[in-house]
Amino acid sequence: MKICLVEPFHTGSHATWAEEYARYSGHEVTLLTLDGRHWKWRMHGGAVALAKRFMAEGLEPDLLLASDMLDLATFLALTRATTANLPTALYCHENQLTYPWSPDDHDPQHKRDAHYAFINYTSALAADAVLFNSHFHLEALISQLPEFL
């Protein structure tokens, strides 16, 4: 099976997971990534840049595996000529609804933090399957989602 793993924030644990998955998978895994910097921009604009590359490179995977840092709904909209019938899975390495904010980040103080969690939510809606790195992580998101919505 050919898998295209899409990761717009390719650094730290995100990079380790993607690279180790590609290395140890029994499948043919192609990494489609952006450098791991400016995470907020990557969540908003990463899908646009990666969709352009996906189309330009003519990738034809059997499965699209997206990181939770990707706005999957936007990515799929921009690549629908190729991905309309492509199975997709969203891998939740973390999520922006329950992930603790840095004390140096001013977005929560200005009530600008909810849209990152909403990107995670709409990405999950757009995916055919949603995978979590742990049962704890799954339960943390599911328990907070009703209040958020």
For the regions a language model picked out, list residue spans one by one.
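A short alpha->loop->secondary-structure connector
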Residues: 82-85, 109-110, 147-149
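Membrane-proximal helix-turn-helix segments that form the acceptor-binding/catalytic region
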Residues: 110-130
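A short, active-site helix/loop in glycosyltransferases that binds the activated sugar's phosphate group
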Residues: 124-149
